[in-house]
Amino acid sequence: MTVGARLRSKAESSLLRRGPRGRGRTEGDEEAAAILEHLEYADEAEAAAESGTSAADERGPGTRGARRVHFALLPERYEPLEEPAPSEQPRKRYRRKLKKYGKNVGKVIIKGCRYVVIGLQGFAAAYSAPFAVATSVVSFVR
């Protein structure tokens, strides 16, 4: 027996399953039982309506039953809640994100400008170096 099967059987034995969807019933019984329970509840409700008592009182405390939902109509002067107008300022989280991106873009621009300046200086030095060498050689030859 594999570990998974052992754990599954242990869990099944320790947990009690109740109701129409429990593992104690077969698949065919499950659907039939649910339909029969529904029909039995309808019969109990009709009998209770005739006798004046509720079906929940007959079943006793602790048993499960259907819940009754009460609907309330809206008053005639119903005014829907107004949503607040969107403010001109961006939301706090969005502002934090913009601030973070702004810092990163600023760093990139600063570093990029430094590298451009260094590159231009190197280009200028390389461009002017042959002339400096030529002038020094010419002055040395004279």
Curated annotation (Swiss-Prot):
Q: How does it sit in the membrane?
A: Single-pass membrane protein
Q: Name the residues that span the membrane.
A: 116-138
Query: Where is this chain's protein located in or outside the cell?
Result: Membrane
> A single Pfam family, by name?
RDD1
GO cellular component terms, alphabetically, are: 9+0 non-motile cilium; membrane
Where primarily located?
A: membrane
Q: What segment(s) does the record annotate as region Disordered?
A: 1-32, 46-66
Keywords, comma-separated and alphabetical: Membrane, Transmembrane, Transmembrane helix
Which terms under GO biological process does the entry name? regulation of response to drug
Q: What PANTHER family does the annotation carry?
A: REQUIRED FOR DRUG-INDUCED DEATH PROTEIN 1 (PTHR14680:SF1), SI:DKEY-126G1.9-RELATED (PTHR14680)
* Described function: Regulates drug efflux through modulation of ABCB1 localization and activity.
Name the UniProt record assigns to this protein:
Required for drug-induced death protein 1
What broad taxonomic lineage does this protein's source fall under? Eukaryota, Metazoa, Chordata, Craniata, Vertebrata
